[in-house]
A protein has these predicted regions:
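N-terminal propeptides/leader regions of secreted preproproteins
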Residues: 1-32, 36
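Secreted/periplasmic proteins
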Residues: 45, 51-54, 99-108, 114, ...
Length: 164
């Protein structure tokens, strides 16, 4: 147990630089916490990704734009990117980048929260409301931290890619 609530953990992680977060997550994952008994696992939350897709198209409709179509070819790329940002929270992709635009986020615990945050950021909003892109894919990768006392914490990693 790191001695903090989920909200405190999210706030702490959001305040870190990418290097600080990488060091912290590595220390947790490899057992250098005080109890040396942390298990880290992860999974893709496809329901959350679908909800982001739906909310994105709702924002587009609210702004008089046509809906994005889902790009199933790019979905595996978005999944890979969501897992990559666990270690390197940046727009630098190991395998290159074939999207027109990319939104990333970390820590938001719901689809509505992440879309709201993106809509309140000029660059992310521009991607969502682009008149160049016609397709998108979304991934939500969730890290689950299980501690010796049985308590758990979750950290959400979000990626939305755009193309035409």
């Amino acid at each position: 147990n790191l001695g903090m609530t989920d909200d405190e953990m999210v706030a702490m992680l959001q305040s870190m630089t990418p290097d600080e977060m990488d060091a912290f997550l590595n220390s947790v994952a490899y057992g250098s916490t005080t109890d040396n008994n942390v298990q880290v696992s992860g999974y893709y939350d496809n329901n959350m990704a679908q909800e982001v897709f739906n909310l994105t198209n709702q924002e587009r409709a609210n702004n008089g734009l046509s809906a994005y179509s889902w790009d199933s070819n790019m979905a595996s790329y978005s999944d890979r990117r969501a897992k990559e940002i666990v270690k390197d929270y940046s727009h630098n992709s190991v395998g290159g980048n074939w999207s027109v635009g990319e939104n990333i986020a970390e820590g938001e615990t719901s689809a509505s929260e992440v879309v709201n945050d993106w809509m309140n950021s000029a660059g992310h909003k521009a991607n969502i409301l682009s008149d160049v892109s016609t397709k998108t894919s979304v991934s939500c990768y969730v890290e689950k931290f299980t501690y010796a006392d049985g308590s758990t914490q979750y950290l959400y990693h979000w990626v939305q890619n755009f193309t035409h």
